[in-house]
From Swiss-Prot:
Belongs to the ATPase alpha/beta chains family. This is ATP synthase subunit alpha. Keywords: ATP synthesis, ATP-binding, Cell inner membrane, Cell membrane, CF(1), Hydrogen ion transport, Ion transport, Membrane, Nucleotide-binding, Translocase, Transport. It comes from Ruegeria sp. (strain TM1040). It is a peripheral membrane protein. Transmembrane segments: none annotated. The gene is atpA. It catalyses: ATP + H2O + 4 H(+)(in) = ADP + phosphate + 5 H(+)(out). SUPFAM superfamilies: C-terminal domain of alpha and beta subunits of F1 ATP synthase (SSF47917), N-terminal domain of alpha and beta subunits of F1 ATP synthase (SSF50615), P-loop containing nucleoside triphosphate hydrolases (SSF52540).
Length: 513
């Protein structure tokens, strides 16, 4: 049977029309089973660990378990639209997220997709979410202060740029409040820095397993205070799948590392890592990995250590940037010896321990000064702060110990009564309302007044009023003196400015009644 001329021309036209169109080649697999946010996929023989794969409908997943006959994939989204037999495509890229200044002021999910309805993010760079931490050579010891604006923290448990300081405590003890105040406190420093990026501190807040309403309130507070302009919020809320809650801290760290590696300074707050560990446990058990203590998988320590080791202070050869971490851990009934709390305590450079009992006594922030410690922060304190804050921690620790014994006996000697009286006033002095951070110079003046006997004749109930009026006096009449404390910081080592500070406090004491 011959081919007619009309057919030949039709075939030629068809060939010419399709000329140069290359077929798209993609390595695909098939879904064997799906459920609980986990898909078993057959056929992706060359897939990499941690690689992104794509399901029908644009749903993404990450290959975690590479087994001999199938691949265990965790799904970043709803698994309801995925069914057995669906095709799964490789993307040939490890999970990465957008990074850069374009993210500032935005609220994103664990993959960097916007959640705030302000349009797409036009980031010029992308960074792999889970990268290796800097080695030993690029690092430098922590030596610059990272002010939180909280008297009890900056004086007794100082945090330096590049440090990892754990905030640990039961639920509803004010852990997030400390972290939020720290972000708000950076506004005055960032405004004072102007265009000098090397002095600014960019903040990244990661909400893991929080209620959406809580995250919305936090974002609203940051926007009202003008703090969103230097902040990024990464949210993997309670309603998000476990893989999203597991990934969010890594993705946020990659965003913060952009600033660290550009010679700038960043702060990252993980709120909180207990919920990330729970999400990771859920994923691991569903992937049939063997459980260990408290049913957590064997590598749950590595989960947190590889995350927190990425926070570091880099030396001048590598840009002198820093990434400071404030991980938050929620304890159950004050049990700091549980598995996850002990893991994170051993990884970090100190902890701020918050106590329910102190919180209910009205001592807020409810910092237990005896159990809290900063292992490297003292070398980052300003000379002014370290010279006046030295006696405070000792005085408070002695007061707490003595107060317990004083309940039993009434005939106390004069020295003990003096210690108890001053301790009660220092405890009162450490109280601070939320959203009211103080500058370094203001804290120095307040602590100096407390440790040098200026409060000894003030009634305990009047300490709050004394502090409020002292701050008003300093801000309105002695603004140049506050600036002088900052400018003449090195002189505090030699004890030179003591007389000048006493003169200012004597002047205020004459007016205070």
């Amino acid at each position: 049977m011959g081919i007619q001329a009309a057919e030949i021309s039709a075939i030629l036209k068809d060939q010419i029309k399709n000329f140069g169109q290359e077929a798209e080649v993609a390595e695909i697999g098939r879904v064997l089973s799906v459920g609980d946010g986990i898909a078993r996929v057959y056929g992706l023989d060359n897939v990499q660990a941690g690689e992104m794969v794509e399901f029908p409908g644009g749903i993404m997943g990450m290959a975690l378990n590479l087994e001999s006959d199938n691949v265990g994939v965790v799904i970043f989204g709803s698994d309801r639209d995925i069914k057995e037999g669906d095709t799964v495509k490789r993307t040939n890229s490890i999970v990465d997220v957008p990074a850069g200044p374009e993210l500032l002021g935005r609220v994103v999910d664990g993959l960097g997709n916007p959640l705030d309805g302000k349009g797409p993010i036009e980031a010029k760079e992308r960074k792999v979410a889970d990268v290796k931490a800097p080695g030993i050579i690029p690092r430098k010891s922590v030596h610059e202060p990272m002010a939180t604006g909280l008297k009890s923290v900056d004086a007794m448990i100082p945090v330096g740029r590049g440090q990892r300081e754990l905030i640990i405590g039961d639920r509803q003890t004010g852990k997030t409040a400390i972290a939020l105040d720290t972000i708000l406190n950076q506004k005055s420093y960032n405004d004072a820095a102007g265009d000098d990026d090397s002095k600014k501190l960019y903040c990244v807040y990661v909400a893991v397993g929080q209620k959406r309403s809580t995250v919305a309130q936090l974002v609203k507070k940051l926007e009202e205070s003008g703090a969103m302009e230097y902040s990024i919020v990464v949210a993997a809320t309670a309603s998000d799948p476990a893989p999203m809650q597991f990934l969010a801290p890594y993705a946020a760290t990659a965003m913060a590392e952009y600033f660290r590696d550009s010679g700038k300074h960043a702060l990252i707050i993980y709120d909180d890592l207990s919920k990330q560990a729970v999400a990771y446990r859920q994923m691991s058990l569903l992937l049939r990995r063997p459980p260990g203590r408290e049913a957590y998988p064997g590598d749950v320590f590595y989960l947190h250590s590889r995350l927190l080791e990425r926070s570091a202070k880099l030396n001048e050869d590598f840009g002198a940037g820093s990434l400071t971490a404030l991980p938050i851990i929620e304890t159950q009934g004050g049990d700091v010896s549980a598995f996850i709390p002990t893991n994170v305590i051993s990884i970090t450079d100190g902890q701020i321990f918050l106590e329910t009992e102190l919180f209910y006594q009205g001592i807020r922030p409810a910092v237990n000064t005896g159990l809290s410690v900063s292992r490297v922060g003292s070398s980052a304190q300003t000379d002014a702060m370290s010279s006046v804050a030295g006696p405070v921690k000792l005085s408070l620790a002695q007061y707490r110990e003595m107060a317990a014994f004083a309940q039993f006996g009434s005939d106390l000697d004069a020295a003990t009564q003096q210690l108890l009286a001053r301790g009660a006033r220092l405890t009162e002095l450490m109280k601070q309302p939320q959203y009211s951070p103080l500058t370094n110079s203001e804290i120095v003046c307040i602590i100096f007044a407390g440790t040098n006997g200026y409060l000894d004749k003030v009634d305990v109930k009047e300490v709050g009023r004394y502090e409020a009026e002292l701050l008003t006096f300093l801000r309105s009449k002695k603004a140049d003196f506050l600036q002088w404390i900052t400018d003449e910081d090195p002189k505090f080592k030699k004890g030179e400015p003591v007389e000048k500070m006493k003169a200012v406090l004597d002047e205020f004491a004459a007016d205070f009644a």
